[in-house]
Amino acid sequence: MKTPLTEAVAAADSQGRFLSNTEVQAASGRFNRAKASLEAAKGLTAKADSLVSSATQAVYTKFPYTTQMEGPNYSATSEGKAKCSRDIGYYLRMITYCLVAGGTGPMDDYLIAGLDEINRTFELSPSWYVEALKHIQSNHGLSGDAATEANSYINYAINALT
C-alpha cells in the first residue's frame, strides 16, 4: 500500500540516497496532521452505523426509484437494502483506512482500482454513492483539523466517482 511517506522512502532507496530536506519536511507535515487524522478515524468509526444508516436513507430520498425497482441492484427488498448499506459502509471504511495510513493508498488499492468495471457490471450508479458520501460529509460531526482531514478523503472518493 502506497502512502506519501512510503513513496518518498522507496524513491530515495531506489536512488541510493538519503531523504531530501523536502521529503523530510513532507514527512514532518504528515506527522503533524496525524493526530487530527486519527481523531477523524475514531470519530467516523464511532458513528459508522448511524452515518451509514442515514446516508443510505439520503440515497433513498434523493433516488426513490432505488427502493421501487425490482432486481438485485436495487433496494426494493431487505436484501437489496442490506447490500446498499454494505457498499456505503465500505466507502466509509476505506476513508478511515486512508486517515490512518496518511494517504489515498488504501482507497486506490482496494476501491478505486476496478470501480468503473464493478459499477458497470452490477449496474450501480455512482451518483448513489456520491449522494451518500456528501451526506456523510455534512453529518459526520467532526470539526477543525479532524474535519479537514476526513473531508479531504471524502472528496477524493467523490472525485473518483464523478
Swiss-Prot record:
Identification of the protein by name: R-phycocyanin-2 subunit alpha
Source lineage: Bacteria, Bacillati, Cyanobacteriota, Cyanophyceae, Synechococcales
Membrane topology: Peripheral membrane protein
Primary role: Light-harvesting photosynthetic bile pigment-protein from the phycobiliprotein complex.
Family matches, as Pfam families: Phycobilisome
SUPFAM superfamilies with a match to the protein in the record: Globin-like (SSF46458)
A biological process from GO: photosynthesis
Family the UniProt entry places it in: Belongs to the phycobiliprotein family.
Organism: Synechococcus sp. (strain WH8020)
Record's keyword terms, sorted: Antenna complex, Bile pigment, Chromophore, Electron transport, Membrane, Photosynthesis, Phycobilisome, Thylakoid, Transport
InterPro entries per UniProt: Globin-like_sf, Phycobilisome_asu/bsu, Phycobilisome_asu/bsu_sf, Phycocyanin_a
Subcellular location, record wording: Cellular thylakoid membrane
Modification note: Contains one covalently linked bilin chromophore.
Chief location: membrane
Complexes and interactors: Heterodimer of an alpha and a beta chain.
Positions bound to (2R,3E)-phycoerythrobilin: C84
GO annotations of cellular component type: phycobilisome; plasma membrane-derived thylakoid membrane
